[in-house]
């Protein structure tokens, strides 16, 4: 309704300015602080009726002194769901008893359930609903399904009320020229559009199998009502509920993802193992090189020791040969001295017995 309050004074102020334009063609008086006025009053506050753009600007009263303008038309539409009773017997006259085809919800609901497409007389909708609800109140099994259905219809009526309010605001802002004929015509059109849907719910409810008062309701008694209640829920949450093929796709994707994760883990594990092995190989190669260097040093030392040993052996051999030569020379000297003494003794003894022996 704020758009009505905002749009009416501007149009009313523009009309006299347009009418006075031919008369005051040479007079051009404008409000110098128009931007300041717009910033001061804001977009949601209507301009006072006594304000004229062709007159000189004067001191305007503060906004809190303005009286709130009366609404152009009385509010109408369905009340909010908390104000409606759970059973739906004492419903507001403006509330429609049946589900209203509006948007994709009505299309999905009509596609799921066939009782919504059956036409029923709209003149006795309230009386038939009242009597039918009295009959259905005796059954305990159908009470919950009916209340669920009424809750769904109340939610859709509240959504329709909000959409009707938005359309009403648009219509009133577009046609706020002092006449309310456009708003009344749009209201009548909406009422005519909503009137055929009022007879749909009794037809869907009359399709339920009724039993006697003494008979207890079976489990199957609530099944015909479930499509009308569940259709809205399915249509509202159709995107959230996965289909069977969607579940298969999701499972397949999960399986593929798990396979990818396992392959990635195995690849990372193998990569870590190869890195560890490469580190071990590098360590072993370094150790082998160090051992080879030590072995070369030991070979050099052993060669030096062998050469020293050979030199020592040569020296020992030389010393041994010198000693033996000295010994032989000494023996020869001793033998030569003893032989000469015996020869001299024999020559000195001139006896015939010893001469041949000495000669021999």
Swiss-Prot record:
Entry keyword Kinase: no
GO cellular component, one term: nucleus
An individual GO BP term: response to blue light
Domain bZIP: 249-312
Region annotation Basic motif: where it falls in the sequence: 251-270
Chain intervals with Low complexity compositional bias: 164-184
GO molecular function: DNA binding; DNA-binding transcription factor activity; sequence-specific DNA binding; transcription cis-regulatory region binding
Subunit structure: DNA-binding heterodimer. Interacts with GBF4. Interacts with BZIP16 and BZIP68.
Name of the protein this chain belongs to: G-box-binding factor 2
Annotated source species: Arabidopsis thaliana (Mouse-ear cress)
């Amino acid at each position: 309704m704020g758009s009505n309050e905002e749009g009416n004074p501007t149009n009313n102020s523009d009309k006299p300015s347009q009418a006075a334009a031919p008369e005051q063609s040479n007079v051009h008086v404008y409000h110098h602080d128009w931007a300041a006025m717009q910033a001061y009053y804001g977009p949601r506050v209507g301009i006072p009726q006594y304000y004229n753009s062709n007159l000189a600007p004067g001191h305007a009263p503060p906004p809190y002194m303005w009286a709130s303008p009366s609404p152009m038309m009385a509010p109408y539409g369905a009340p909010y769901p908390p104000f409606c009773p759970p059973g739906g017997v004492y419903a507001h006259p403006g509330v429609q008893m049946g589900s209203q085809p509006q948007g994709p919800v009505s299309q999905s609901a009509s596609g799921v359930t066939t009782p919504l497409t059956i036409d029923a007389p709209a003149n006795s909708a309230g009386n038939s609903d009242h009597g039918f609800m009295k009959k259905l109140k005796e059954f305990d099994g159908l009470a919950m399904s009916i209340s669920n259905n009424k809750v769904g219809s109340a939610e859709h009526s509240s959504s329709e009320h909000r959409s009707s309010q938005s359309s009403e605001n648009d219509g009133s802002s577009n046609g706020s020229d002092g006449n309310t004929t456009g708003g009344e015509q749009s209201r009548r059109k909406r009422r005519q559009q909503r009137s055929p849907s009022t007879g749909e719910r009794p037809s869907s409810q009359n399709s339920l199998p009724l039993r006697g008062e003494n008979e207890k309701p079976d489990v199957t008694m609530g099944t015909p009502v479930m499509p009308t209640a569940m259709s809205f829920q399915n249509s509202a949450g159709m995107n959230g509920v996965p289909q069977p093929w969607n579940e298969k796709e999701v499972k397949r994707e999960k399986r593929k993802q798990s396979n990818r994760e396992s392959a990635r883990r195995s690849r990372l594990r193998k990569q870590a193992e190869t890195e560890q092995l490469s580190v071990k190989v590098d360590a072993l190669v370094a150790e082998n090189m160090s051992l080879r260097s030590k072995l070369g040093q030991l070979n050099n030392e052993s060669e030096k020791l062998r050469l020293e040993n050979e030199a020592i052996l040569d020296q020992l051999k030389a010393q041994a040969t010198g000693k033996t030569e000295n010994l032989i020379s000494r023996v020869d000297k001793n033998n030569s001295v003893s032989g000469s003494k015996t020869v001299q003794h024999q020559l000195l003894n001139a006896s015939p017995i010893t001469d041949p022996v000495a000669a021999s």
